[in-house]
């Protein structure tokens, strides 16, 4: 069961309803800009990968060792599906072979981000063309992910030595990573994958989401008893603030998981989390990096959080009952957010190694990628555009 959370009424819905809906032509033009950038980046990265965030809006080149590399490959698959250019497919497949090698050698995989790595890269290729090596890599990644499952508390431990008190926590981001396990269940019929994903989802829904439908970034459990302990931040402004990207992981992770659980209490959880996010957007509909900030705060936006939220709202609109009073507002809100990203945050400099989406934040506390592009922002921006452009078979 999912606990009851506050569902705020959407404030001033006319701020979304008055924005014209995007046309297919407008979306197509925005995708064409991204494709132009990716064509430059293909030659720039070749078979290597971008770093998580840019420096002066250009990505340095790195090996396949970060938690973010799957988003680059996911961009290539999206670009291939749209353009049918073999150049995108060929490099994306070479990336997939690199991911297979990485999981076989267990290179920098002792964390929960296996889904971010293997879903938009390997699972994507398998869904597109049935590639056997892509399937093999995806299932091996799922097996690696369930090694982090903690019976006491019923969750996937995010980082650090397994079972250690100082690391005994989940994070809201993992709502996206557990989609890897639902895929493994569908492919193998092995119930353990489903059960672990389900358990982690409910542990997250009932703990990392606060009663007011805002979210902690991370939540600790007692390793001796498995009882919930406390929520703290790692990327947000403070322990009691609401990190924008974390909230958007909730906006997207809930509908993705609903597809498998069919638990209709997900609807109210989604509405609570999403309405909280929408009510804290500034005038241009693109969130600051923490939702305690708004217009006049002199803080950085996180465009990636808004791109993720657009994808989440788009996904849940497939499932919400037609009689839901907010359904039309959600539709207009996602259009308003994506329109703002297209018109004010899309990069049109077309530099080799450049980002597609400006004004993101990687880690404010660490001073990394503040007011820069980041590779998940680029990915989810393109995914949102593709969602609006065509009937897309999602990778997640």
UniProtKB/Swiss-Prot annotation:
Substrate binds at residues 113, 173, 231, 233, 245, 249, 363, 366. One of its GO terms (biological process) is polysaccharide catabolic process. Keywords: Hydrolase. InterPro entries: 6-hairpin_glycosidase_sf, 6hp_glycosidase-like_sf, Glyco_hydro_88, UG_Glycosaminoglycan_Hydrolase. Its EC number is 3.2.1.180. It comes from the Bacteria. The active site is at residues 113, 173. Disulfide bonds: none annotated. Optimum pH is 5.5. It catalyses: beta-D-4-deoxy-Delta(4)-GlcpA-(1->3)-beta-D-GalpNAc6S + H2O = N-acetyl-beta-D-galactosamine 6-sulfate + 5-dehydro-4-deoxy-D-glucuronate. Belongs to the glycosyl hydrolase 88 family. This is Unsaturated chondroitin disaccharide hydrolase.
